[in-house]
Amino acid sequence: MTDTEMLRPILRGAWGRDTCDPHDLPDWTPENPARGQCGVTALIVQELLGGDLVLGEVLVGGGRVGYHYWNRLPGGRDIDFTADQFRPDEVVTGGTIQAVPVGGPRRCREQWELLRGRVLTALDDQERSRSVADGETPNRAR
């Protein structure tokens, strides 16, 4: 079972310049690893936890400068793993439900595949570690 608090550090550790949306690369830094990660992250969270993709607009001084994705979980709670990427002058508004692209995104596909692979590997490693801690022997026939 994957929960949001377990997922948060895994996502944060998996983000990198190579998983950033190309539009946001000029603003991405290791000090702000969430920058440009919203779309690919929201798709992976939706795959793991279900619910809806939500899309809002990013405004600066009242003018749109971009878009932002986050998740609405099956119980109706919104969760945004990349909300801390924004500067004080950037405001996210709106929020409309978006269709989940079948087979993954067309845009930022390489970034999504890379991030998805890192996250799934980390979750698998965590599950294996938990099994060993619980006394199970990994990869052995019983």
Label for each model-derived stretch:
Residues 1-142:
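A structural boundary/capping signal
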